[in-house]
Design a protein with these regions (language model features):
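Alpha-helical promoter-recognition and RNA polymerase-docking modules of transcription initiation factors
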Residues: 3-125, 129-147, 160
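Long, charge-dense, solvent-exposed interaction surfaces that engage phosphate-rich ligands
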Residues: 142-183
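Short intrinsically disordered, low-complexity coil segments enriched in acidic
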Residues: 1-4, 183
C-alpha cells in the first residue's frame, strides 16, 4: 500500500523531468507536517502519508545524487531512496519533537546503502562487514583525493589509499576494479 505513495522515476524517462516534477510538490511548514504525521499515526490516513512523502522527494533526490559514482542507474537509486522515505513516514513519531526530514535521512540512506551493497558483485560473492566498510571508505577517500573518474588507480594512488585505510594494496586494487565495473 505504501509503495504507491511516491512517484517513481521512469527508467525510460528523463531524470531532469522527474526532478522538475518533484519540485511541484510543496514543502510543508513544521505545524502542517506535525498535523499530517499525527493524522497518519492515529488513523493511517493515506492522504496524509502521501503529502508527507511527496513533500520530501527532493530530499531523496539530493541524497541519491551522492551515490552517482557507484555506476548504478540513478533512477533506481532514487526509487530505493523513496522506499526508505516511505518507511520513515510509517515509523515517524511526531511527538518526539524532530522534523520528518531529520528522521527520514537515516531511512533513505539505509535503503540506498542496502541497494548499493546488494547491487555489487563483492557482496554477491560473499562479503563480510569489514569488506563492506572498506567499500564505503574507499569511495570516500577517492572522493576526498579527487579520484572520482572511472579509471584504474595508478600504483602510487593505490599505495596512498592503502596506507591511509591501513589495508593491503591488493584489496584496494581489487575493490577499485569492482567499483569501476572491470571485475
Amino acid at each position: 500500500k505504501a509503495v504507491a505513495l511516491a512517484p517513481a522515476p521512469n527508467p525510460e524517462g528523463s531524470l531532469s523531468r522527474y526532478l522538475t516534477d518533484i519540485r511541484k510538490f510543496p514543502m510543508l511548514e513544521a505545524q502542517e507536517e506535525f498535523e499530517l504525521a499525527k493524522d497518519y499515526a492515529k488513523s493511517g490516513d493515506t492522504k496524509s502519508a502521501h503529502k508527507l512523502v511527496t513533500s520530501h522527494l527532493r530530499l531523496v533526490a539530493k541524497i541519491a545524487m551522492g551515490y552517482r559514482g557507484y555506476g548504478l542507474p540513478i533512477g533506481e537509486v532514487i526509487s530505493e531512496g523513496n522506499v526508505g522515505l516511505m518507511r520513515a513516514v510509517q515509523k515517524f513519531d511526531p511527538d518526539r519533537g524532530f522534523r520528518l526530514a531529520t528522521y527520514a535521512m537515516w531511512w533513505i540512506r539505509a535503503a540506498i546503502g542496502e541497494f548499493v551493497l546488494n547491487s555489487w558483485s563483492i557482496v554477491k560473492t560473499g562479503s563480510n562487514a569489514a569488506r563492506k566498510r572498506l567499500f564505503f571508505k574507499l569511495k570516500g577517500v577517492k572522493a576526498r583525493l579527487g579520484m572520482l573518474d572511472d579509471r584504474e588507480l595508478s600504483p602510487l594512488e593505490t599505495r596512498q589509499i592503502a596506507s591511509e585505510l591501513q589495508v593491503p594494496e591488493h584489496e584496494v586494487t581489487d575493490l577499485s576494479r569492482r567499483m569501476i565495473g572491470s571485475d
